[in-house]
Amino acid sequence: LIANEQVPEGDKLPSLIKMDQVLNSNSPLTAIKSISYGQSMLAVRLAQARGYTDGVYLNQNGDVVETGSANIVILKNEKFITPSLESGCLPGITRQILIKHFGISEELFSWDEMLESDAVFLCSSIRLLIPVSKVEGKLFEKNPLGEKLIGDLNQIIRSKIEL
């Protein structure tokens, strides 16, 4: 089952902050989605307490992993990139669709590389793909390539749903 929310506008778009807690990409629990959402809720609550909507986890090597509620996609030099599974991220359904159908690249990248990117997006089964408005102090404008990818993803999802 895939759900889809409307893309929020302006200041309702997600904003991200770096979490102090580090994820261990070598943990045997890495990439296992469980019914325990404690760590995910921690990221969201700590971020909200600081005026952001979600927190970004890094692994022990300083690589971006994911947020408390979604996988991450960045756009850098007209190339969409999501953290590789080696980072310790969950192999989310929407992430897998983006890789399979849109050629999104899987690579390791740092917090600084994310800040230097042209755009940042969150992807999840609930939101599909949504642009991020701010990562700590850096504001991100809407990006035409990102808007096209969002539209194309929504179209492919709708084409697979039988009513």
Segments from the language model and where they lie:
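Helix-start/capping segments and mature chain N-termini
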Residues: 1-163
